[in-house]
Amino acid sequence: MQGGIQEEKTFQRNIKEALGDKDVTRDFFNIGRICVPQNLNDAKRRVFANLDRFKFHYLAMTAIFTLIYVLYRLELIILIGIVAAGVYAYRVRPTVCNIELEPRSVCIAGFVGILIFFIFFKEAIVGLLAISALCGIVTLTHAALLGEGLQKDDEV
């Protein structure tokens, strides 16, 4: 139980840091800092530094794109419901007809439900994978191109 409370406090602190520092948000949207990396090592360094510094912004961008796509393809709400029901049943272990559901049974039922969903709604899943790939490409491109000002952070 202690671990859960500690994780919640850490999560809240991270959210406050991400939202409280206006310089980070300004740096994220500052197109004046965009420049092509000199070599592959410079690109890797930038990507790792920017992914660490702007993780909340990249996560928010991905969540917004995904939410827009879910609103466009409403059948994905069924998938969200299947996953949510599976997580709930796995954690709570409800009783159905005087039989307690085991985690193994819940995982198998969830897998079968998701598989059936994939069979009937192929286009929605392909679109979701395309959105994921697009977000990954945009994130890595932004992280690799955003360069100036990183030297100040590295020296501190």
Curated annotation (Swiss-Prot):
Sequence intervals crossing the membrane: 54-71, 75-92, 104-121, 125-147
PANTHER family per the UniProt record, alphabetical? PRENYLATED RAB ACCEPTOR 1-RELATED, PRENYLATED RAB ACCEPTOR PROTEIN 1
What is the protein's major site of localization?
membrane
Keywords assigned by UniProt?
Membrane, Transmembrane, Transmembrane helix
Question: InterPro entries from the entry?
Answer: Prenylated_rab_accept_PRA1
Q: How does it sit in the membrane?
A: Multi-pass membrane protein
UniProt name for this protein: Uncharacterized membrane protein ECU02_1470
Quote the cellular component terms of the Gene Ontology held in the record: Golgi apparatus; membrane
The record's subcellular locations are:
Membrane
